[in-house]
Every structure is written in structure tokens, then in C-alpha cells.
């Protein structure tokens, strides 16, 4: 059977879905299907395809979920400019099998390196449900994610082989970022103007500090580097429900990097837990993370270094919040989410004394 080509959601037909199943090793024939948008992605759009079979072979799924470039022109242009689409496909093709973190099974994925058009057909993780940045997570869910973070980071801890891969953000082989210090400062000024009535004075002070230190903040980490997610938040995870599903699955690998592992942890805990809950359980969660690193082979990294690197890490959540707000298609939910992310990150940075040159 001919290998599937790269298609937009509206161009998909039963024959194409049959070819996708064949790529995954299933001999079946799709007769018809229904398609429904799912998820809350800012850069990519996801669609659930519920399948009806003329011939259902062994292992044929009831449904698949496809991910595609965002339909919104502004969001799509951002995904292309930042290399998000190419990066996610390459992650699943080359790094996911060794990453130790739970990711969805991929039935088929491909990307056009010239246009960055892509398709990612994955298992439907229902009845698991997508996390919600605005709702946050429970403490039990935070513990699950902390363990997943430790496993992910241990998988490529100090692995300088990642430096040779141009599609790994932060690697030595990666092309120069299209975003520079001046652009970040301008985006912050635009964000500050747009959301002035929703910003606390101390958040604005943090933003003025972060926005004038963009390059320096990206280079400040002085510890081992590892494979990081770089957008490690509930919206990019699926959690089990009473009806079933994997305990937690990590999605949306568009921003992964060779970077500082504790930054992922700060990014998640600062944004996903209420401040009082995070403060009450932060020490235990850091200990759980360090124990997971050690259980997965990491040596020579102690709690003092972890606390320092974790305390510095929430800057990326703050930066992502105002940067993304200004370069993706605007929505009401997006407005609320970016303010929540930014405020939580600012509070974390102030608490941990991160505003130091």
C-alpha cells in the first residue's frame, strides 16, 4: 500500500486512514469516519477521527487523533518560524522511544522540511482527559508529573549527542533563534499595554526585568543539561479518569530542548498548583524529583544544586506567557491562561529570589 502523504484535516478520506493503519501494522479497511476538533492547542490543531470499518483487522482502533498545523494564520506562521512543527515530528521519530516519559503511540507522522506542513496521527488517549492550565492539577497528579519529569530528564542527562542535532532547540547545531532581545522587549511592551488592567505592579516589575535579560537568562544555567519539554504544563498532558486511561501522558513536543531539567519542574509546579499548595509540598516534590533522577542513573547532582536551578526556572513560564500571547491567534481562554501563567511565574520568581543578575 502507498505510504500516506501529508494532508490537512479537510483532505483526509477513508483510503488515507486505511493507509495510516497499515503504517502502524494493522491490516484493515476504513469504510467511513467522523471527525471532531479536540484539545486547546495554541500552535497546532487536533482532530479525533472515529472510524467505521469495512474490514476490521486485529488491533484496529476505534479512533485516532490527528495533529496538524494551526488553522489560524498567525499561529501557523509562528509554528513555522519557530520550527515547532518540524521539531515535534523529529521528536517522535527519533527521541520518544528512549525518552522514558509516557507519550502516545504514533501511527504515522511526517513533515515537509520546506513548508513545515506536517501530520501526526496518534492513539486516542480517551477516556483520559486533557489537563487544564486554568483549573490546575491535584497534588496526586503533581506527584505523577514530577516522576515523569525525572524520568524524562534522566533519559538524556548530560547527553552531548543532542548538541549535534539541528532540530533540538538549544543545541550547538541548532540555527540561531529568529527571536532576539529587541523583539522580546517589544513583545513585553505590547503585552503590558494590552493587559495593563490585569497586571499586578510586582508582575510588571518582573516583566521589566525578564524582558531586558532574554539572552542572558537562556544562558544562565550552570549545571548539567538534558532533554527537556520546555512547555511542561497541564494543557500538554492527558490524565486518567475514573473511566480509565494512562495515569499521565505527555504531549505537544513542539518546543523540546537540550536544556535545564529543573526549569521544566519549575514551569509545571509554578503554573499548575495553587501557590499555597505548592509552598506546602514543594520540598517533598523536589525530593521526589531528585529520587527519580537517581533511580534512573543520574549521579553527582544534589539537592543544593536542584534548589538553585529550580528557583531560577520559572522565568521560562513567564517568558512563554507574554511571548505566546502576542504571537498566536487571540482567544478569551488564551487571555485568561496567559495571565494565569505569567502571574504564577512571577510569584514563584519573587519567592525564590530569582531576580538576581
Label each residue range with its predicted role.
Residues 31-38, 107-109, 215-216:
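Short amphipathic beta-strand and strand-loop transition segments with alternating hydrophobic
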Residues 39-180, 261-262, 303:
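Conserved ATP-binding subdomain of kinase catalytic cores across diverse folds
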Residues 40-58, 65, 211-261:
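Active-site acidic catalytic loop and adjacent metal/ATP-binding pocket
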Residues 74-77, 130-135, 250-251, 267-275:
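Glycine- and acidic
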Residues 90, 255-297, 314-334:
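Active-site activation/catalytic loop segments of kinase-like enzymes and analogous catalytic loops
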Residues 298-314, 345:
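All-alpha amphipathic helical-bundle segments outside canonical DNA-binding/catalytic cores
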Amino acid at each position: 500500500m502507498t505510504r500516506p502523504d501529508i494532508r490537512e484535516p479537510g483532505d483526509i478520506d477513508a483510503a488515507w486512514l486505511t493507509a495510516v493503519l497499515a503504517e502502524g501494522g494493522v491490516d484493515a479497511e476504513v469504510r467511513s469516519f467522523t471527525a471532531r476538533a479536540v484539545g486547546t492547542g495554541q500552535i497546532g490543531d487536533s482532530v479525533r477521527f472515529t472510524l467505521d470499518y469495512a474490514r476490521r483487522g486485529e488491533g484496529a482502533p476505534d479512533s485516532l487523533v490527528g495533529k496538524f498545523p494551526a488553522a489560524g494564520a498567525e499561529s501557523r506562521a509562528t509554528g513555522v518560524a519557530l520550527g515547532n512543527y518540524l521539531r515535534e515530528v523529529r521528536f517522535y521519530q527519533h527521541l520518544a522511544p528512549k525518552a522514558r516519559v509516557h507519550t502516545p503511540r504514533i501511527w504515522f507522522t511526517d513533515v515537509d522540511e520546506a513548508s513545515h506542513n506536517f501530520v501526526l496521527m496518534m492513539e486516542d488517549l480517551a477516556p483520559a482527559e486533557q489537563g487544564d492550565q486554568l483549573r490546575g492539577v491535584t497534588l496526586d497528579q503533581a506527584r505523577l508529573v514530577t516522576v515523569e519529569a525525572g524520568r524524562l530528564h534522566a533519559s538524556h542527562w548530560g547527553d552531548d549527542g543532542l548538541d549535534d542535532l539541528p532540530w533540538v532547540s538549544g543545541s550547538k547545531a541548532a540555527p540561531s533563534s529568529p527571536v532576539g532581545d529587541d523583539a522580546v522587549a517589544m513583545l513585553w511592551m505590547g503585552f503590558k499595554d494590552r493587559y495593563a488592567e490585569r497586571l499586578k505592579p510586582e508582575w510588571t516589575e518582573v516583566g521589566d526585568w525578564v524582558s531586558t535579560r532574554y539572552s542572558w537568562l537562556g544562558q544562565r544555567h550552570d549545571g548539567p543539561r538534558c532533554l527537556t519539554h520546555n512547555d511542561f504544563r497541564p494543557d500538554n498532558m492527558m490524565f486518567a479518569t475514573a473511566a480509565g486511561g494512562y495515569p499521565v501522558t505527555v504531549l505537544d513536543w513542539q518546543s523540546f530542548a537540550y536544556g535545564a531539567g529543573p526549569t521544566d519542574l519549575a514551569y509545571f509546579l509554578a503554573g499548575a498548583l495553587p501557590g499555597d499548595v505548592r509552598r506546602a509540598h514543594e520540598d517533598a516534590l523536589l525530593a521526589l524529583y531528585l529520587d527519580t533522577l537517581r533511580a534512573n542513573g543520574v549521579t553527582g547532582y544534589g539537592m543544593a544544586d536542584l534548589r538553585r536551578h529550580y528557583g531560577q526556572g520559572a522565568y521560562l513560564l513567564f517568558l512563554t506567557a507574554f511571548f505566546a500571547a502576542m504571537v498566536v491567534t487571540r482567544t478569551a481562554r488564551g487571555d485568561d491562561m496567559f495571565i494565569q501563567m505569567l502571574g504564577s511565574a512571577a510569584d514563584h520568581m519573587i519567592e525564590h529570589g530569582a531576580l538576581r543578575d
